[in-house]
Amino acid sequence: MRITIKNTVNGEVLSKEFIVKVQYDKTKPIVKLEKDQYGRAVFTIWQEKITTVSCHEYDPEKTSSRTIYTGTTTCDYHDAKHYSKKLGKQIAWLNCVNELLSNGVVTDEEADALDMIELDATAFELDMASKKLKKID
């Protein structure tokens, strides 16, 4: 996914472009043996999913040595009431935005706008001057 942030500084339009990738990895199977409310043995096997969102600033003039910022989360999809794939992806994205903010890549205002983006499109265009977010499918 591609995110473009357009910002106007002293009448000059500046833009930043980010490439965002989402990756899912599974942990080793988790085995749990417990007793239910009637005293019967219950044997359960499930896997947790690690969701990783990586983001780097796209600059065609800079072909090497890009800093990649990542956000990860581990979701226990065994408990489907509390975790979903979409929620795990959103938490990992927020962690990635926090890393971009803490490293000074984006401003507070840009980070607040990036928090609103859901990673379900091909591209987003964020215009900070007019405060508009445009989804491009």
Kindly label every feature range from the protein language model.
Residues 1-11, 129, 136-137:
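Classical N-terminal secretory signal peptides
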Residues 2-5, 14-33, 108:
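C-terminal binding/interaction regions
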Residues 2-4, 18, 44, 67, ...:
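Generic short N-terminal amphipathic or hydrophobic helices
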Residues 10, 14, 19, 23-25, ...:
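Intrinsically disordered and other compositionally biased segments
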Residues 17, 22-23, 34-37, 73, ...:
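Generic hydrophobic, helix-prone segments enriched in Leu/Val/Ile
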Residues 33-89, 99:
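Positively charged, aromatic-enriched nucleic acid-contacting surfaces
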Residues 90-103, 107:
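Short, compact, well-ordered microdomains
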Residues 102-137:
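Intrinsically disordered, low-complexity charged/polar segments
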